[in-house]
Every structure is written in structure tokens, then in C-alpha cells.
Amino acid sequence: MSYLHFDKTLMINLEESLPREILRTNKSGAYHCTTIVDCNTRKYHGLLVIPVPNLDDENHVLLSSLDETVIQHGAEFNLGLHKYQGNHFSPNGHKYIREFDCEHIPATTYRVGGVILRKEKIFVHHENRILIRYTLVDAHSATTLRFRPFLAFRSVREYTHENSQASRDYQLVENGIKTCMYPGYPELFMQLNKKNEFHYEPNWYRGIEYPKEQERGYDFNEDLYVPGYFEVDIKKGESIIFSAGISEISPRRLKQTFEAEVADRTPRDSFYHCLKNSAHQFHNKQEEDHYILAGYPWFKCRARDMFVSLPGLTLAVDEIGEFEDVMETARKAINNYIKGEPIDCKIYEMDDPDVLLWAVWALQQYAKETSREQCRAKYGSLLEEIIDFIRQRKHDNLFLHENGLLYANGADRAITWMNSTVNGRPVIPRTGYIVEINALWYNALRFIADLVREGGNGLLADSLDAQAEVTGKSFVEVFRNEYGYLLDCVDGNMMDWSVRPNMIFTVAFDYSPLDRVQKKQVLDIVTKELLTPKGLRTLSPKSGGYNPNYVGPQIQRDYAYHQGTAWPWLMGFYMEAYLRIYKMSGISFVERQLIGLEDEMTSHCVGSLPELFDGNPPFKGRGAVSFAMNVAEILRILKLLSKYNL
């Protein structure tokens, strides 16, 4: 039995199969995403979803889906599946599914009477193209396949409806057609590796619904355009490949291309290999720049997410060169920001006050994975520029006070990772001395001090250490309370006593102002009140305002976003903290905690981790189907565990 295998019983039960999604991407930000029964349930779903830079910086759904029909003796068996009004599903092709497997590539096996048909999909790595291979495993009479493409040509943020502006024109190309519904879009080429007949029958399929959007309180129906259908005969043992892309391809190359792409894939045959494959999906290369996307299907490259994710997505899977490529792009953005220049790359939210400190943390992980010497040679000047920028009080919203702590104004704007807003106002106004920002600050001071001292700059090292002494003393005085945990933020007489996970970073980081007893007290309360099988809760059930369920319309979800939901990426730092306290004796506990996350490999987005979970049982996955920080941090912990187990 393969690691990611789903049998007929699960597949034909839509309550079980529809919540499970698959995601495949290439390095340009394009992707294919749908459910494991190929029924689109989100406006973001599609067979071919690509960036169209001349229109905007969003992705666009070109080919929404492809309905297949098996024809024998004039009888038609449609394998497609769409949801329409009134919980009506048609044409119910899922009832023919015998099994689905995606350990290597997504493969669905259908049984229609005496016909056994296997469908395999692969998203090409280095171009915007999806290939689908149909193999007739068994048949006792002449068989024809019909392919009916459903076109959208719209942004993932919008819907399309029947209209007179959509072009119905098409042109024949070798073994297929090309078409483009609206100006500004690339042409869509749909071709087969075998001669076929295209029947031009333009039609709009009206009222297709996306239940995931309905759950989230958004509009949820659209019309999709079908230009006609392809028909091709297929023999027992024969394979036919359908290609959809934005450039023409020689049909004679399709078989070779498909096989080469398959050979290039790492099977998802374990927890680690699932996460490693998922890690590769967040990389986005645009000309000279290399980014990390925060998540799929709707996130872009956000600075904080990128720096938190970078070590886990690269160093933890032994891809140091990828780390350096991403950091080269990030370095340009950091230099732009420090110099007060417009940021000339697509990294968003560079001005958030913790971003530069997370960049230092990421480089600290690089130093640990390579060497301090290599880090100093490659990034020493950047680290010194960052620390000097903050110490000279040049940051727009990071103010170094005489007590050595950093102050940030978040009263009117969400400035940390807890960034939900309603009507333009932060749901959690974290302002003043913020606990993880100052933990990052202390860690950065000590790390850079050690780095530059080893490089011969004792004067700067002594200055940074002196600063850290002041910062560390104030940190304990300001944040630690009589109950042994840390206040979340402090602004004058205003103190946030909520039990939140942001204190765990102080225990996890290499350098901490807390002693071992103080660290253990923090770890104990986090374990007792915030730990779940899926991550750390963002708020203790004992604190006021606890709301563990991320459900309902946008506003309701925004209020719940960081008020009790559980986030897997925090588990990474929690496990690191646990191992710092308990060392070898903590390994078995950490390994047990990972079981709840490995269980997610066959749920939600198969082979990846979603954005967040409800904070109470059954801890249902919510939000974006695949989230970079979550995947990264669990990979980082798996790498850390491997070092302990040497």
C-alpha cells in the first residue's frame, strides 16, 4: 500500500473526498489545484492557473477543468463532477472511481463496466503546462474518449459569467486548438499526442458553485465556457496525453516530456518526503529574483513569512544554494528599505518592525548549517548594516529606548504576525514592548556580537554585548510576571496578561535573557495551556476572548484568526524549546507530538500542512491549503531530531 492512497469507499463518499485537495506547482507561481475527485470547490481551483504579469500580480484560471467521457457502443459515461445549486452534483463521475493514489503523481483509476481507465496528471516544472495521461488498462470493445474543456480566463479573485465580450474564436493547431477569451490573456493551447476530432459546440455551463467559498461567506457561483469537445479512439494498453499550456508543443514530444517529468519527481512516500515536495512548491523564480510564497492558493511573498520559512524550506532539506539565491533577492529589498528607497522586487510588508530581526534569525540558521566563517564572509556586512540601522533609531517603527528594549507602535495597525484586521483596525492591537520582537532583538545582539568578535572586530562585539546586557536585564523586569510566564506586550501601564505563544521564542532561540528555571516555567505554561496535536494555540482557553473556531464569513474569521486557533509553525519553536530544556530525554515526546501533524498528510491538502487549525477537537484544518511557515518549521524540527539521533 502506498503512503498516499485512497480507496473507492472514501472516493465515492463526497463528505470524505471533497475536503481533500491536491496542489501541484511550478517555479513561476503557476499551479494546478483541485479536490481528489477533480471537483472544483474553490474559485482558486483549476487545472491550469498561471500569473499574467501584463494584467496584474494575481494568478488567473485559464483552464478550470476537463470533463472526460468514456464512449462504448454509443453509450456515454461522463467522468466529470461539478456542483450546482441545491447541493446537486453532476455528472457524478466520482461513482466510477476505483482508487486514487498520489504518492508519485496524482493517479485516478476509473472502472466503467468492463473498462478500466487510469488518469495521471503532472504539472510541468519549467513552463506553464499541465499534462494528463489516459491509459486504457482494460476494455472488451471499441472505446472512444471525449474531452470537454471548461474555460474561465479570469483572476482567482473574481468570477466569470456568460457575456458577449468573450471571444468564441479558435484556431486549429497540430492535434488540437488554441483559443483566447479576452484581450491581454495568453492563448491557451490544448493538444493531444494523437490525431483527434475537435467538435466546435460553444456553450456556457451556468451556475457552477464553489462550496468552500460559500463556507467563507463569499460569492460562490459562476458560469464556465466550453468551446466544444475533442474525441479520440483509444485501444487497450494505449496511452493518450492531453496537454494544456500557453505555447504550442509538438505532439510527438508529449510522451517524452511526460516521462521525463515523472522521472524528475521525488515520491511522497514518507512524512519527510511529503514535506520536502511541499517545500519546493513555495519557491517562485522571476527572472533574476527568487522568492518564497507565503502559501497557496492566495498568498504572495510576505517578508516575515519568507525569513521564518527560509531555513526550513532550504537548509533543512540540504539546499544551501537555494537559501543563498532567495537571500540574494531579499538582500536587495533590505538594502532598499534601509536606504529609504522603493523596494524594487515583489516582497511585501518589509516595513513591519520584526522583519529585519527575522532576517537575522534566518542568517543565524545559515551560520549553524554551514559555518560562522562562511556566514560572516557572505553576510557579515548585511548583519552589521541591519543592527546599526536599528541601533541608530532609523527604523520607521522600531524605537530603541534607554532601557535597551525595542518599542513598536501597533495601536492603529497590525504590525506583527498576529495581523488580522477588521475595518482597518487590528483585532489584537499589540503595541509597545512586544515580547517576541525583544526576544529576537536580544538574540540578534548576541549572535552578531559573537560573529564579529570571531572576525576580529572586538570593539563592535563589546558594544553589542553591552547593549545586550542592558536589554536582557530590562526584558526580565518588563515581561516576566509573578506567575512565571511572559506578558505578551507592555505599553506603559498597559500590560497584556493573555497567555499567548509568542513567549516561546525566548526559550527556543540560541540566546535568551532567561535563565533555565525561567525558561522551564514558560515552557510548562505553554505546554499546559497552548499545546494541541496540530500546533500551539494563539490564546489560552483560560484567557478572555478565547475563540478556537475559524469559521463563518470574513469578519467572524478575522476575529478568530489569533484568538485560540492552533498554528503548526509555532510547534517548531515549541519543540526546539522543549529539546533545549530536556535535551535527549525530550526526543520521544517531540516525536509523539509530530504524529498529529503526520496524520494531516492524507487530509486537507494531501501531502502538505494547511494554514491553521481550530483550537479545540477535532482540530479541523482551515485557511490556505498549504502554508510555507508550517511546512518549513516541521522540516526544521525533523532535521534537528536527526542530529539528536546520530
What are these regions (language model features)?
Residues L79-I105, V112-G114, Q392-H395, D524-T532, ...:
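Non-catalytic C-terminal accessory modules of carbohydrate-active enzymes
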Residues D138-A139, T160-N163, L172, I234-K236, ...:
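Aromatic-rich carbohydrate-recognition surfaces in CAZymes
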Residues H280-C301, K339-W358, A362, Y366, ...:
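Carbohydrate-binding/catalytic loop surfaces
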Residues H273, R391, L398-H401, Y442-Y550, ...:
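Catalytic cores of carbohydrate-active enzymes
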Residues M1-P267, P297, R304, E319, ...:
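Terminal accessory carbohydrate-recognition/targeting modules of carbohydrate-active enzymes
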Residues N277-K285, E328-N336, D599-V606:
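Glycine-rich, acidic and aromatic/proline-enriched surface loops and short helix-turn segments
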Residues R252, Y366-K378, F447-L464, V517, ...:
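Inter-helical turn/loop segments and adjacent helix faces that build the functional surface
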Residues S243-N277, V308-L313, D318-E328, R516-E529:
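Carboxylate/His-rich catalytic cores and anion/metal-binding grooves
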